[in-house]
Amino acid sequence: MAVKRTSLRAINTKIALSYDRVRYEPDVVGELDPEWVLGLAALYGVRRPSEVIDVLDLGCGTGAQLERVASMTSGRLVGTDLSRSACERAAERTMDLGDRVDVRCVDFLDLNRDDLGQFDLIYHVGVSYVIPAEVRTAALALIAECLRPGGVVVISYHSGTVPLLLAGIRQALRACIDGSRPEGEQVQAARSRLHEIEGWLSRDGGDHAAMRAALRGLARTNDVVFFHEMLNECFTPLSTAGLEAELSSSGVHFLNWIKPGPFGELARAMDRALVADAVSFADGGYRYGVFAKCEVAEEVSARSPDLLWETRLTRIDNDRGEPVFCDGSDDCLRVINPVTEALLDLLSSEPYRFAELRTRVAGLFAGRLEESTVDEVLNRDLVGLWSRGLVRARWQPVPAAVSGTGPD
C-alpha cells in the first residue's frame, strides 16, 4: 500500500506542476453561489440549522470561488490545492479576509477530517475527473467525512457523448505528442494537430457535425483545461450513478444538477442519477452535481420557508390579449391557468416566499378556490417552472424571530 500511495503522490505532483507551468485563471460560475446551491438542497427537504455556513473548496485553484463566497457568509473558509503557485495566488486574493480563510497547499492523500473539521458546503470543481481513480475515491471519502449532517457538496464532471466522441482523438494525441516536453509546448502541438483534424473533417463531406462541434469547444478552452482534458492520462468521464453509488454508503446522496435536469421529481436518489446519465448520454455535457448528506432526499417541494422564489420573466400580453411571459429570448411561455398567471405576475414584480405567495393567490381567488387547492397548484407550478429554469429558488433563511410563520 505504501508503494501505491508513493506512486499516486508522484502522479499528483505531476498534475500540480502542470498547473504551475501553465497560467490558469478559472471563470467563477454564479450558479454555484451558496444561495443557489443551498436553495436547491432546501427543495429536497435539506435544511440548514444556521445562516452562517463554513465552506471548504477541495481543489481551490487560485481562490476565485473562495473570494466570491467570502462575501456571502461570515463562516470559516478553507481551500486546498496541489499547485503551489495557485495556492499563493489564492492566499493573496483572500489575505484581507483575515484568519477565517485558510489556504493549504496539500495532497488529498494527506488530509482527513481531524485536520480540516466539518463544513456546511464543499466545492469539488474541476478536479474529480483529472485525478487517478484511487485519489478520487480518497477525495470522495474525505468529502463524506467532512460534510456536516445536512451539508451539501458540488462536484463537477464530464459525462455523456462528447467525452466518448473525443476518446479516440485523445488517445491519438497522447501517442503522438512528446510527453517529456514542457506542458505549454505539448498544448501548442496538440492544438495544431486538432486544427489539422478539423480541417480534414470539413473537407471530407461526411456528417461530422458532432465531432466538429466538440473540437470547436476545445479550441475555446484555456490551456490548463485543454491539457488536462486531452493530454492528462488520468482524465476520466464520470457518471452520476457512479458518484451516487460511491457516496451513498456514507449517507451522501445525489439531488440534481445545479441547472435542474428533467428528473427532479423522482423520489429516489439513484433513480435521479440513472435518468441524469441517460440524459447525458443523449446530449453530453459538463455537469455540476449537487449532493447532500441526509438520511434520504425527499421528493422535491417548493414549500420550504427558507426559500425565496424569483423569476426573470416579464409579462407581455399578445395580440389576442393572452398572457405571455418572456425572459428576453425568443422563447415565451403562454399561460392558460389563471393560478399560474397570478403566480408569475407576482414573481415578476418581486421575490416571494411560498407562504406569502399562497396568501396572496388565495386572496385573489377567494370564494373560488380552497386554500388547500391553491397550495397544491402553487407547489406543482413552482416545481415545474423551476425544473425548466423559468423560476429560481434562493436560500434565504427566515430570521429566527419570525421562523414560526412558515407554511404547515
Give short role names for the model-derived ranges.
Residues G30-I53:
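Conserved alpha-helix/loop element of class I SAM-dependent methyltransferases that forms part
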Residues T62-T73:
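Conserved SAM-binding loop of SAM-dependent methyltransferases across substrates and taxa
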Residues R76-D81:
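Conserved SAM-binding motif I beta-strand of class I
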Residues R84, E265-F291, C332-D408:
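Long, charge-rich, low-complexity alpha-helical segments
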Residues G98-D110:
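Conserved SAM-binding strand-loop segment of SAM-dependent methyltransferases
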Residues R113-I122:
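A short acidic, Gly/Pro-enriched loop at the edge of an enzyme's catalytic core
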Residues T137-P149:
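A short glycine-rich, Lys/Arg-flanked "PGG" loop and its adjoining helix->strand segment in the class I
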Residues V154-R181, A189, R193, I197-R203:
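Conserved class I S-adenosyl-L-methionine
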